[in-house]
């Protein structure tokens, strides 16, 4: 509690780390740090999660027009299917020790810089392609990330012109992000 006349300030990194401590350590959730840091920092950033538990944050600098164009290519839909993120993430964590899963994760990490460059250069088609390839790899990480209904929604979006699509969060349901030319919305 702040004393009278004193203002307590917290920085974004502290807020992200405290959110992780609560979910990971206190609640014992088998999750990563991405969501907490994204919420704490806001905006467009590259987050690099290091082996020593530190996090490097690199803002992606684009002008307002580019940000508007980037946003215009995205559509987010709630597709239902409430699920337990913990069970999917727990399974994914166990599976990620397998060599083929490690390679998929390394490939997904390798997309980060190319995705940032595609945003900076306004290469929206490449953004969609990277999102799509990322989703393809994500589905291979564990059972339960996708299902026939999610695959059907994905196929429908692609059929109607989406360059890429992915499920947000752990998988199994929730929100589906499509990245497509605005005229295809």
Specify the residue positions occupied by each region the protein language model found:
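Glycine-rich nucleotide-binding loop
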Residues: 171-173
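C-terminal nucleotide
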Residues: 3-30, 34-167, 177-185
């Amino acid at each position: 509690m702040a004393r009278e006349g004193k203002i307590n300030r917290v920085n974004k990194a502290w807020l992200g780390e405290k959110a992780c401590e609560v979910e990971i350590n206190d609640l014992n959730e088998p999750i990563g740090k991405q969501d907490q840091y994204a919420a704490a920092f806001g905006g467009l950033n590259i987050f690099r999660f290091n082996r020593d538990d530190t996090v490097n944050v690199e803002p992606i600098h684009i002008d307002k027009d580019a940000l508007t164009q980037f946003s215009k290519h995205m559509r987010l839909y709630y597709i239902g299917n409430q699920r337990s993120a913990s069970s999917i993430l727990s399974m994914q964590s166990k599976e990620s020790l397998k060599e083929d899963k490690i390679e998929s994760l390394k490939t997904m990490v390798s997309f980060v810089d190319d995705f940032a460059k595609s945003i900076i250069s306004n290469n929206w088609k490449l953004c969609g392609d990277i999102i799509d390839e990322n989703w393809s790899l994500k589905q291979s990480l564990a059972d339960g990330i996708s299902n026939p209904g999610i695959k059907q929604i994905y196929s429908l979006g692609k059929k109607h012109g989406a360059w890429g699509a992915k499920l947000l969060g752990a998988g199994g349901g929730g929100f589906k992000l499509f990245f497509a030319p605005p005229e295809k919305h």
